[in-house]
Amino acid sequence: MVKLTSIVAGVAAIAAGVAAAPATTTLSPSDERVNLVELGVYVSDIRAHLAEYYMFQAAHPTETYPVEIAEAVFNYGDFTTMLTGIPADQVTRVITGVPWYSTRLRPAISSALSKDGIYTAVPN
């Protein structure tokens, strides 16, 4: 795990690489394809609101992030292979752990999933 401050330098290219799923695909919220879309939105949000993430990190110094995010950020390349394998619970914890999840991230994630034809359903 690494702090957000150590992953900031290369955020720019990460949001571009999520492969689109076929139209009208229904997946579990913990499906890796859903996680990759969520992480793409998350990284894009970090880039767009870097100061807020720095302030959040300063207020929560023990909050850590999966090292794969840092590796993807610093590589500047296709991040999908780097971010595969991050457990769904870690993806959820990182993304929902910021105060702006409900107002900014959740709507952006819903939009990105819909654009890729991905709909989520909680398994019974």
UniProtKB/Swiss-Prot annotation:
Query: Does the record's keyword annotation contain Cell wall biogenesis/degradation?
Result: yes
Consult the record and explain the modifications the protein receives after translation: O-glycosylated.
Per the UniProt entry, what is one GO biological process?
Answer: fungal-type cell wall organization
> Would you tell me the Gene Ontology cellular component terms?
extracellular region; fungal-type cell wall; fungal-type vacuole
Task: Report the domain of life of the source organism.
Answer: Eukaryota
List where in the cell it is found.
Answer: Secreted, Cell wall
What triggers production of this protein? Induced at low temperature and during anaerobic growth and completely repressed during aerobic growth. Induced at an early stage of fermentation and remains almost constant throughout the entire fermentation process.
Where is the secretion signal located? Answer: 1-20
Q: Does Cell wall biogenesis/degradation appear among the keywords?
A: yes
- Keyword terms, alphabetized: Cell wall, Cell wall biogenesis/degradation, Glycoprotein, Secreted, Signal
Any one GO MF annotation of this record: structural constituent of cell wall
* Major subcellular site: secreted
Assigned protein family: Belongs to the SRP1/TIP1 family. Seripauperin subfamily.
The record describes the protein's role as: Component of the cell wall.
Question: What is the protein's given name?
Answer: Seripauperin-23
Q: Which organism is it from?
A: Saccharomyces cerevisiae (strain ATCC 204508 / S288c)
The coding gene here is PAU23
